[in-house]
Design a protein with these regions (language model features):
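Structural core segment of the AMP-binding/adenylate-forming
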Residues: 19, 56-57, 84-154, 280, ...
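AMP-binding/adenylate-forming catalytic core of the ANL superfamily
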Residues: 96, 113, 354, 374-379, ...
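Conserved AMP-binding/adenylation subdomain of ANL enzymes
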Residues: 197-215, 223-263, 278
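AMP-binding/adenylate-forming catalytic domain of the ANL superfamily
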Residues: 138, 493-515, 534-542
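Conserved AMP-binding/adenylate-forming core of the ANL superfamily
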Residues: 8-10, 19, 27-72, 76-80, ...
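Conserved AMP-binding A3 loop
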Residues: 39-41, 174-198
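Conserved pre-ATP/AMP-binding loop-to-beta segment of ANL
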Residues: 11, 71, 143, 158-178, ...
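Gly/Ser/Thr-rich phosphate-binding loop
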Residues: 237, 262-267, 276-339, 353
Length: 542
C-alpha cells in the first residue's frame, strides 16, 4: 500500500498518480478479475502502449473517446490512457440501445468509440447513422458485423510513449458523464481531475480509512461515478487492489467477497435490500467484509444489515455527477460525530461552503426548506460545465453558487443538513412543502404496491400550488382499490400525504438507468382513468 500525497495539486491528475504508484508501489496489485491481476507497474506500461495506439488513431488533447464496455479491466486501462493524451473519456450506459444510444453517441462528438464483443450488436444496429468516429472493438473484427472496426489488441501492440505529465492540469476535463435523463434529454457533465479527487480525499477515503491488506470489491456498473469514487480511483490513490466484478449477484455476493478476501465495498439501490431479504444462514457473519457503503437503507434496515453480516456501513452524504461531493457527515471533522443522525447529509467539507437558498438565490431562514447550493473555496470543485450546453450551465448557478437541484433543511441544534427531495419533484400544497420521496416511501410499504411515483399536478384553485398525484403499479393479481390505498397512507402518514389524484398503471416510464421519468407523468396529467379524492366516498382523517 502506498498513498499518494494529494496536498500538492500537481499530483491531482490520474496519470501523475499512476506514475507515482508505478514507481513506489510497482508490484502492488491494482486491478483484479477472475482471469487477471495487474500491478500498478503493469497498468502503467499497458496504458502507455494504449496511449500510443490511440494517438496513432488521431486522439489528441481536448478530444473525447466514448466507451461502451462491460465491467472489466479494459475500461480502466482505456480511461487512464485517454487521459494521458489530454483527452476525456465518456462512458456510455451499457443498457442503452436504439435511438437512445444513437443520440448519446452523436452528442458526444467523439473521435473514437470503443465497444466490446458483448455489446457490439447494439452499435451494429445504428452504425449507418453514425458520423466519422472510428470504432475500436475489443474482440475479433474479422468475425464482427461492424464496418471497418479496429482491433483493440493492435493498440496494445504499439511501443510505449513517454508522457509529459506537466502538460496535464488538475483542472482539465478528464471525463464526461451523462445525467440519467429524468427531466428530459441527458446532459454531459464535464468533470475535472480535481472534481473526482476531492470527493475521494474529503469523502470516500475518510469513510473507509484503508489500511494495508484492504481489498475493494466493486459490483457497480463502470458508467456510474460511484464505481470510480469508491472503487477504481480510490484504489489508485491509496495503492490497494480493486476487484472488478461483471455484475452484482445476490446469490454469489458473499462467496465472491470471501474468494477475493475483500474488505471494502459499495452497493447501491435495491442491492442492500436484496441481500437483507435473502434467506438467513448460520454463517452470514462469516465474511471478510469490514466496511461498505449501502445506499439507501432505512435506519431499521441499516441496524439489521450491520448486525446480521457484521459489516460497518459508511455514513451519509450528498454527491452528484456535477459535484461528486457536496457534503458528508465528517465535514471538516476528523472523526465521526455521534450527535448526528445516520440519515443526515452532514456538513460542507474543507474546500467549499453550503447554503440553502430560495428561488431567487437568497439564503432561507433557519428551519426553512431551501435548495442546497455549494460555493467552491478552491478551484475545480464542481463541474467545468455541461458539454455543448451553455444554457444549462448558466441555469445551474446562482453567481458563484452551484445549484444542486436538491431541497434540504438544516437541523437548528447541530447545523447538519438533511435531504428533503429533488426540487423538480417536491410540490407545494396548502402552504406546505411536500416531499414526493416521503410520500412514495409510505405508499410502497403496502404489500400490494409494486412501484409508485408521486408528482404534482397544477392546482386549478391556487396558481402557485400543486395537487398530489400517485401513479401506482400493483402487484400481480392485486385487487387493491384507490380507497384502500388512500386509507393506508392516511393511517401511516400525515393527512396531507393522501393524494388528490391516483391512477393504477401497468408500468412507469423509465430511463435506461431505471429512474422514473416524472416529467412524462406530469405531461400526461389526469385522464378518464384517474381517481379523484374529491369525487370519491373516502373522507380523509385529520
Amino acid at each position: 500500500m502506498y498513498r499518494v500525497d494529494m496536498t500538492d495539486t500537481q499530483n491531482r491528475t490520474f496519470p501523475s498518480i499512476l506514475s507515482q504508484q508505478a514507481s513506489y508501489n510497482a508490484n502492488g496489485e491494482f486491478l483484479v478479475t477472475d482471469k487477471r491481476r495487474l500491478s500498478f507497474a503493469e497498468v502503467e506500461q499497458q496504458t502507455n502502449q494504449l496511449a500510443a495506439g490511440l494517438r496513432n488513431l488521431g486522439v489528441a488533447a481536448g478530444d473525447r473517446v466514448a466507451l461502451m464496455l462491460s465491467n472489466d479491466i479494459e475500461i480502466v486501462l482505456l480511461a487512464l490512457a485517454i487521459n494521458k493524451l489530454g483527452a476525456a473519456w465518456t462512458p456510455i450506459n451499457a443498457e442503452y440501445k436504439g435511438d437512445w444510444l444513437l443520440d448519446n453517441v452523436l452528442r458526444c462528438r467523439c473521435t473514437l468509440l470503443v465497444v466490446d464483443e458483448a455489446l457490439q450488436s447494439r452499435i451494429v444496429a445504428i452504425q449507418d447513422q453514425l458520423g466519422d468516429e472510428k470504432i475500436v472493438l475489443i474482440g475479433d473484427p474479422q468475425s464482427s458485423d461492424l464496418t471497418h472496426a479496429i482491433s483493440y489488441q493492435s493498440l496494445l501492440a504499439c511501443d510505449e510513449i513517454n508522457i509529459d505529465l506537466s502538460t496535464i492540469d488538475y483542472g482539465d476535463t478528464c471525463s464526461i458523464l451523462w445525467t440519467s435523463g429524468t427531466t428530459g434529454k441527458s446532459k454531459g457533465v464535464m468533470q475535472s481531475y480535481n472534481c473526482w479527487i476531492r470527493a475521494i480525499i474529503y469523502g470516500a477515503s475518510k469513510q473507509y480509512d484503508s489500511v494495508a491488506g484492504d481489498v475493494i470489491y466493486n459490483t457497480l456498473p463502470m458508467y456510474h461515478s460511484a464505481a470510480w469514487i469508491t472503487g477504481i480511483y480510490r484504489a489508485l490513490i491509496e495503492g490497494i487492489p480493486c476487484v472488478i466484478e461483471q455484475k452484482f449477484s445476490v446469490t454469489t455476493f458473499w462467496d465472491r467477497i470471501s474468494e477475493f478476501k475483500a474488505t471494502q465495498s459499495f452497493i447501491l439501490g435495491a442491492m442492500g435490500v436484496f441481500l437483507l431479504n435473502a434467506p438467513e444462514k448460520d454463517n452470514d457473519a462469516d465474511n471478510t467484509l469490514r466496511i461498505s457503503g449501502v445506499v439507501p437503507l432505512s435506519p431499521e434496515q441499516r441496524v439489521r444489515f450491520e448486525e446480521r453480516f457484521q459489516v460497518k456501513i459508511t455514513r451519509g452524504g450528498l454527491g452528484q455527477s456535477e459535484c461528486l461531493l457536496v457534503c458528508n457527515q465528517f465535514g471538516t471533522f476528523k472523526e465521526e460525530r455521534d450527535d448526528i443522525p445516520l440519515h443526515a447529509l452532514g456538513y460542507a467539507v474543507e474546500d467549499s461552503e453550503v447554503c440553502l437558498m430560495d428561488d431567487n438565490g437568497k439564503p432561507v431562514d433557519d428551519e426553512q426548506i431551501g435548495e442546497i447550493c455549494i460555493r467552491p473555496l478552491q478551484p475545480y470543485v464542481v463541474l467545468n460545465g455541461y458539454f455543448d450546453n451553455p444554457e444549462a450551465t448558466a441555469e445551474a448557478f446562482f453567481g458563484e453558487w452551484y445549484r444542486t437541484g436538491d431541497l434540504g433543511r438544516k437541523d437548528p441544534d447541530n447545523g447538519a443538513l438533511f435531504f428533503v427531495d429533488r426540487k423538480k419533484d417536491a410540490i407545494r400544497f396548502a402552504g406546505r412543502n411536500i416531499s414526493t420521496m416521503e410520500v412514495e416511501s409510505v405508499a410502497i410499504r403496502h404489500p400490494e404496491v409494486k412501484e409508485v411515483a408521486a408528482f404534482g399536478i397544477a392546482s386549478a384553485e391556487v396558481e402557485s400550488e400543486h395537487e398530489l398525484k400517485l401513479n401506482v403499479v400493483r402487484t400481480e393479481g392485486s385487487q387493491l382499490s384507490h380507497e384502500t390505498l388512500a386509507e393506508f397512507i392516511n393511517d401511516n402518514a400525515p393527512h396531507y400525504f393522501v393524494p388528490r389524484y391516483m391512477e393504477f398503471v401497468d408500468s412507469l416510464p423509465m430511463t435506461p438507468t431505471s429512474k422514473v421519468q416524472k416529467f412524462k407523468l406530469r405531461e400526461a396529467g389526469i385522464n378518464a382513468a384517474t381517481w379523484d379524492l374529491k369525487a370519491s366516498s373516502y373522507q380523509v382523517k385529520r
